[in-house]
Structure formats: C-alpha cells, structure tokens
Amino acid sequence: MSTAQPPTPAAGPEQPLDLAGIGIGPFNLSLAALAHGIPCLRTAFYEQRPAFHWHPGLLIDGAKVQVPFLADLVTLANPTSPWTFLNYLKAHERLFPFYNAERFHIERAEYDAYCRWVSHHLPGLHFGHQIDAVRWNHDHLLFELDYTELDATGEARHMGRGYARALVLGVGTEPHVPAPLCPLVDTPGVPVIHSADYLEHREALLATGHVTVVGSGQSGAEVFLDLLRNRPPGAEGLHWLTRTPAFAPMEYSKLGLEHFTPDYARYFHALPECVRDQLVPRQWQLYKGIAHDTMTDIHDELYRRTRHGGWPDTVLTPGVTVRTAGRTAAARLELHLEHAQQGARSRHITEAVVLATGYRERRIDTIIAALDPYIRRDSRERPRIDEHHRIVLDPIVKGPIYVQNAQRHAHGVGAPDLGLAAWRSAVILNSLTTEPVYPLPPRTAFTTFGLQPTHPGSAAGHLPEQRDSFRSSDTQAILG
C-alpha cells in the first residue's frame, strides 16, 4: 500500500469511525497494527508528515535501540501478528542472517526501516493529513475532526470533516532547548543545533575546528562518539558538558528493568500526585543514562588515541550548567558555565554546539483546544489521565480520548518506552471492544511494588465497568 492516497469524500456522522488516531509515530503505529486484526473495528490514523520516519537525525551508523527487538510494534501483545519484526525479516528474506547475527538489540536504522515497512503496507494510515480542529458534537455524541490533505510540497489540496466515537493522540515529543541557548538556536546561521538534527549537519560539524556537545544522555554520548571517531587524532577539538554529576550508565539490571512493566505502571499511577512528581526526576538513570556499550566504546576510542603518547584533545566535564550564551566578536560561541559542586564559574569558547538536551512532551491540549473546557486537570494544570490512558473529561463528553507518550506524570518512566507500546495499545483496544481481544497477563514482574499490590481489573487489563464498547459493520476508513 502506498502512503500517498487520493482524497476521499468526507463521511457524515451516520458512518463514524470507532477510533481516529492523530499522529503516526511508533506508538500509534503499534495501535493501528493491533487494531488491524480486530473485525468490525473501524479505525483511521492521520499524520501531517508525508511519510513515517523515526528520529532521522539520530540514525547514526551503529547506534542501537535500547530495548530488545521483541519490543516491536506488536509482539508483546500478539506475537502471531503479521506486523512483527520477525515477519519483517522474513518478508525481506533476512531471517537466517539475523539468526546467525545473534542480535538482541537492533540498530536504530533497522527499527526505522521496520516501522516504515509496516507503514507502507498497513491500511488505514493517512500521511499528509493535517488535523485542524477537534470538537465534541453534542447532537451526534461524536468527535468532529476537521482536516486538510496536503500535497507533496505541504500545500493544501483538499479539506474535509470526519466523525469518530473515540480519539487517540499520539503527537509525540519535540526537542527541548534550554532557555539560555534559545536565542542562539533561533538565530539563522548560528551553528547551534539540537541532536535531533545531527545527521543533517554532521559533515559541517566534522569540518568545524571545535565542537561542544551539551547533554549526558544516550543521544549526547552517541553524537560525541561519532564526532570523536571521525576527527583526526590529536586534533579532536571536542568538549562534552553535562549537568548531571557524572557520565552515568543507564540502569539496566534485570530487576531494574521491571520499572518498565505494566505492574510498575499500575503501581505508579495509583500513587498520590505529589509522590509521582517527586519520583520521576529521581529515577533519571532509568531513562537518561548511557548504555554500557556506548560508554565502553567512548573510553576505548579515547584510550586508542593515547597509544602514541599524549592525550586526545577532548574535555569531558560533568556537573556543569550553562548559565548564559552568546556570540563573540570573532563569530565564535561563548558559553558561561557554572560547576555545581565547586561553585566556580568560567567562560567557554567554541565554534559549534550540539544540544543533546532531550525532548519534551508536546502539549496534547493544544490540538484539542476546543475541548479544553471539558478536560479535568491536576494541581499542576496537566490533563488527568486514568489507568487506561484516557484523559479524564467532563461527563458531558461521552467519548474517550486516549493519549500515547504524553503521560509520564501519570504512568511513570515507562510512558515513552518502546517496550510498553504493544501492551498499552492492547489496553486501549480492550477498552474499545465488547470483549477483550488481547488477553493480558495480570502479573508481569517479579518485584512487588508497594505493600498493597495493584492488580488490573481483570486479566484483560481493563475495568469492565469503564469499558467503552463500540460496534460497527465494516473496517473501511472514512476520513482522509
């Protein structure tokens, strides 16, 4: 199936979708893939971009996904699905090479290729479709979606309206730029980029005399390593600065990984809001640390460059905050730094900066601004999210709105983790069908979190009295 689709006539409220998805990243792609196996469930998913591409600026050669290949779009909910990573390999006659490679973790570029394969063959995905507005239609008791179909240049080609009984928002994250560096990032021609755009600027960075990488997570480590490997010994000209007190490894012990299970997600969701807000920043090594292999590769490369005497022209400094930033008269960049433990301050001159400063959840309430009066919020004005990943709404709105990767404050560190994608998709779909279509295990971890263990309402992972059951007669998408 091609991702380029001709416009179809807008349907009326007499033919609503059971579920309309806004955004097609890995999480909504997972949901679409699992929904494809459910008879009589009418779904369609919409994405403004012309095609699927997963973090294209960070598909560095050799960079690996930090979860096993079993954490694909569907396997942990339905390993017999045609959309598994193993079936992707089979379709490309690569099963035996993969088997002999004995790889549990695949490269990012391969994960991206797998997802693009699914996006090209899975029906009901509408790329080049911009959702303009979402409203609740009180007369029809349906969500009303206005959309614009875009041509290859991004210009409007067709406008339409559709209706759905339920929505799922998968609008993803956006690069985070620390406030002191925003003026430089927003100035054209200034060599300050976010790591999300690294590959686009890689050749220019390799030709630059001195580069500073800011940020200590996996992306920062991969960018630093790639620059280090491709710059001449003795003339590396690299600084790596991080606010964390150390270049710390990611927590990857077997029991530590149980923080990325449905058991922990349920436990976390049941905690008081104030406790949840304290926990997430304390758990930074669960999701902001560096893979052991990457740290080893960096140290090995640095050590290799000492074999002929001397030290590489690199500086790695943790515990540093960028207070302010600007440009010098010589058109270089000047960062004003402060060391957290010493209390000392210094001026750092460089020619280019790569910000590996992470991502922030996009505000989900902007895309559904017309529904803002109906959204129930917590003490910090964030949308409240229930156990089944639904925004808590005023009862006047009868249809549910689900969210993907926008609920770390409600479901913990596992919210953006690819390993929970299939499980969360199954939970959402089970709540949409009369009977659970993907039975889920009531227990998923050896760790018992809390003195009063939390258990799902049933083995299917939903509470029957909260289920939103929809029926329809066919699976044809009606939007787009």
Residues of each region from the PLM?
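Flavin (primarily FAD) cofactor-binding/catalytic cores of flavoenzymes
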Residues: 2-50, 54-56, 98-218, 222-480
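A conserved beta-strand/loop capping segment in the N-terminal third of enzymes
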Residues: 75-108
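Conserved N-terminal ligand/cofactor-binding loop architecture of enzyme catalytic domains
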Residues: 55, 59-88
